């Protein structure tokens, strides 16, 4: 019942192209020492791309905060990520600068985040999070481009009454478990919203998850629209099966074994399903 998540739109092309050119630079540039890594990254963005940024390195994570005009579009109180050509190029430049530094650093970086605001849209910001191993794998053609984008966390936040608190969004030694929860929650949500079977009759809300004491827990938020039919037992079972297939695929592709089980909760019905790790692998799609 779950459709494959749609590919990221064409507006990411400039960012992708900047990544592709970097594979020629990887391993050839200078080594960036940890004490100066954040400062070198800021200097690179300012001098080569004329874009002031603020970079922070905490533990093994890098966060870059920047302002890019034209990144967001506001219409009647609604905000969407719709960068202009120039804004997309600037975002790609930030990505390129980060990769040039972290892939040549003398200190292992696990994750990086870009937190970008648009001066024309106060109260809104976009956060992009990536795992460095995914970056290396896409450079080596070990994963396809579409899969790389699916592994990228891209969240848009909008609260005109609450300005951006940089301390709240800076990465603090993110774990792989946390990253996988964020990624799988977003992929589940996108998959349900792309499923034509549910598009007309049901509202798909945010799918949220957590990893706690060896258990991955996810809430599937799917409610019938006003006057619409409740989900049948067969539909609920199909939703759970599809969710488990997606979760199994992601964890298998990351070779992640440090968990005991997966638990699903459907909102608003309250129906649940749990499977141990050994059974989860039976939900892996069969090779075509």
Q: What function would you assign to each model-found segment?
A:
Residues 36-58:
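Post-signal peptide N-terminal segment of mature Sec-exported envelope proteins
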Residues 38, 80-101, 232-248:
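Well-ordered, non-membrane alpha-helical segments in soluble/globular domains
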Residues 2-15:
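Bacterial N-terminal signal peptides that target proteins for export
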Residues 58, 63-74, 103-245, 249-288:
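Polar/charged, Gly/Pro-rich intrinsically disordered segments
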Residues 71-83:
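Surface-exposed acidic loop/strand-edge motifs in secreted or periplasmic proteins
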Residues 32-35, 39, 87-119:
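Polyanion-binding and phosphate-handling cores
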Residues 24-27:
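C-terminal motif of bacterial Sec signal peptides marking the signal peptidase cleavage site
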């Amino acid at each position: 019942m779950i459709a494959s998540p749609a590919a990221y739109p064409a507006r990411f092309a400039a960012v992708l192209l900047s990544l592709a050119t970097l594979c020629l630079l990887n391993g050839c540039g200078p080594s960036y020492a940890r004490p100066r890594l954040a400062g070198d990254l800021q200097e690179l963005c300012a001098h080569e791309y004329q874009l002031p940024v603020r970079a922070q390195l905490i533990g093994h994570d890098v966060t870059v905060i920047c302002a890019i005009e034209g990144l967001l579009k506001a219409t009647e109180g609604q905000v969407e990520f719709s960068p202009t050509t120039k804004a997309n190029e600037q975002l790609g430049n930030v990505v390129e600068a980060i990769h040039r530094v972290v892939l040549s650093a003398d200190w292992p970086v696990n994750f990086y985040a870009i937190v970008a605001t648009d001066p024309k849209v106060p109260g809104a910001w976009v956060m992009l999070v990536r795992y460095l191993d995914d970056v290396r794998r896409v450079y080596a053609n070990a994963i396809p481009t579409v899969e790389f984008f699916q592994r990228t966390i891209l969240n848009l936040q909008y609260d005109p009454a609450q300005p951006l608190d940089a301390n709240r969004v800076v990465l603090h030694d993110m774990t792989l478990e946390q990253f996988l929860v964020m990624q799988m929650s977003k992929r589940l949500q996108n998959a349900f919203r792309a499923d034509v079977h549910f598009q007309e009759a049901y509202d798909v809300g945010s799918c949220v998850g957590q990893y706690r004491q060896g258990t991955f827990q996810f809430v599937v938020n799917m409610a019938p629209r006003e006057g619409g039919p409740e989900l049948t037992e067969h539909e609920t079972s199909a939703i759970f099966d599809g969710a488990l297939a997606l979760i199994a695929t992601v964890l298998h592709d990351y070779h992640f074994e440090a968990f005991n089980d997966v638990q699903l909760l459907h909102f608003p019905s309250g129906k649940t399903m749990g499977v141990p790790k050994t059974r989860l692998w039976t939900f892996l799609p069969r090779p075509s």
